[in-house]
């Protein structure tokens, strides 16, 4: 699929395809759509990042609040987005011991109490042990530092989800 295909998508098609690149934030995809034409996948990714960077802190916190707790109730209930479910499975968060699940639950609650948004990390770039260590460490960050760190993680997730979309296109086409 050439980049022209993405450029020629109408609003609904574009939001349908890219609406969860930023977890549960189709409005970001809607805003990015207005910046067509895209010259490359990298340019499209940059537009997602630029949109987020221009948000005030409250907007960035809103994006973070759309993310589920890692190994939380949405995973247990099966109500995660398909992307989040795959990411948490890949990180091993479905194979926690009782002690790990309890520890992660307590850390998630403490983190949310401190920062007022869930802990966000690119699960696909980490495993369950690293995620628990990062959560244990990052809970001590300043609110400003943690907001910036969490948004950087959202951008990593965005990058991988855009690559997933690219990898679903027919072979022999290019962006």
Specify the residue positions occupied by each region the protein language model found.
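Aromatic-anchored, charged helix-turn/loop surface patch used as a conserved interaction hotspot
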Residues: 3-8, 20, 27-107, 157-175
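C-terminal non-catalytic interaction appendages of large macromolecular assemblies
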Residues: 96-100, 104-169
């Amino acid at each position: 699929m050439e980049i022209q295909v993405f450029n020629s998508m109408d609003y609904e098609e574009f939001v349908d395809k890219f609406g969860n690149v930023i977890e549960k934030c189709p409005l970001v995809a809607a805003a990015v759509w207005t910046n067509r034409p895209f010259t490359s996948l990298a340019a499209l990714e940059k537009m997602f990042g630029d949109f987020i960077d221009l948000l005030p802190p409250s907007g960035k916190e809103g994006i973070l609040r759309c993310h589920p707790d890692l190994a939380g109730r949405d995973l247990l209930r099966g109500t995660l987005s398909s992307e989040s479910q795959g990411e948490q499975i890949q990180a091993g968060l479905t194979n926690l011991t009782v002690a790990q699940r309890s520890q992660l639950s307590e850390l998630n609650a403490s983190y949310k109490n401190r920062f007022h948004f869930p802990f966000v990390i690119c699960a696909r770039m980490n495993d369950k042990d690293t995620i628990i260590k990062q959560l244990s460490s990052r809970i001590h960050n300043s609110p400003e530092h943690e907001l910036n760190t969490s948004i950087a993680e959202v951008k990593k997730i965005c990058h991988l989800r855009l690559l997933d979309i690219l990898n679903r296109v027919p072979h022999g086409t290019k962006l």
